[in-house]
């Protein structure tokens, strides 16, 4: 007569254990799939945060950046000027080009040629050597204060609005009288929040800007100390 080895688990117990593992694995797969879907759907919104615009503000500030970015930001700011929402446009520019040309002069000619002399006469330039959004905000604060402008619409690329908004509100905090900042985002072809994973350029922008956002959220200015940039107004 054959005897069953008492060390071997009962067959029903093995089946129950296998079924339990399958359920656990299935739940893990479902959770991961749901998380991935939510990430792809809403991941682009991490970078974008715009504000409802006021009926009127003193100035629309165009932040510096890539050629495509500046062109789109300039169009957005000029549109606000034409709509009567702002009285002036302030563009952040370096003093000279690589070839020694005066950037304010070249930029004024650009505005006059593309938007007309009436628009060009309403554009002022904040001239400063900056290499980060943090430095740029500090320089532009000086230019804004020199004009007495406190109601400010900051025009930048859509993917830059959340990070730039946090930087600007920190840079202009404790001013007396206080600044009122509104963030306006424009599409420059580098990023769209919806379907951001479908194009290589959008993914590159998302990775770069998200890493900056995370870094500045954790470390602020980082382990180094930035030298404040001096901004001066040229019209």
What would you call each of these model-derived segments?
Residues 199-228:
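A transmembrane-helix-recognition feature enriched in membrane-embedded lipid enzymes
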């Amino acid at each position: 007569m054959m005897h069953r080895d008492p060390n071997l688990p009962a067959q029903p117990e093995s089946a129950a254990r296998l079924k339990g593992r399958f359920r656990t694995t299935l739940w893990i797969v479902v959770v991961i799939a749901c998380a991935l879907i939510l990430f792809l759907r809403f991941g682009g919104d991490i970078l974008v945060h715009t504000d409802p615009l006021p009926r009127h503000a003193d100035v629309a500030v165009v932040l510096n950046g890539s050629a495509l970015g500046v062109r789109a930001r300039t169009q957005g700011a000029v549109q606000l000027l034409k709509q009567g929402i702002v009285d002036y446009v302030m563009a952040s520019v370096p003093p000279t080009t690589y070839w020694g040309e005066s950037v304010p002069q070249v930029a004024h000619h650009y505005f006059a040629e593309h938007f007309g002399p009436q628009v060009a006469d309403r554009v002022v330039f904040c001239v400063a050597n900056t290499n980060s959004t943090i430095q740029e905000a500090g320089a532009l604060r000086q230019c804004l204060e020199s004009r007495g402008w406190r109601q400010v619409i900051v025009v930048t690329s859509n993917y830059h609005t959340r990070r730039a908004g946090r930087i600007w509100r920190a840079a202009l905090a404790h001013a007396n009288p206080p600044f009122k900042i509104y963030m306006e985002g424009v599409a420059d072809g580098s990023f769209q929040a919806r379907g951001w994973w479908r194009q290589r350029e959008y993914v590159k922008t998302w990775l770069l800007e998200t890493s900056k956002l995370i870094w500045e959220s954790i470390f602020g200015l980082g382990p180094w100390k930035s030298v404040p940039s001096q901004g001066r107004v040229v019209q």
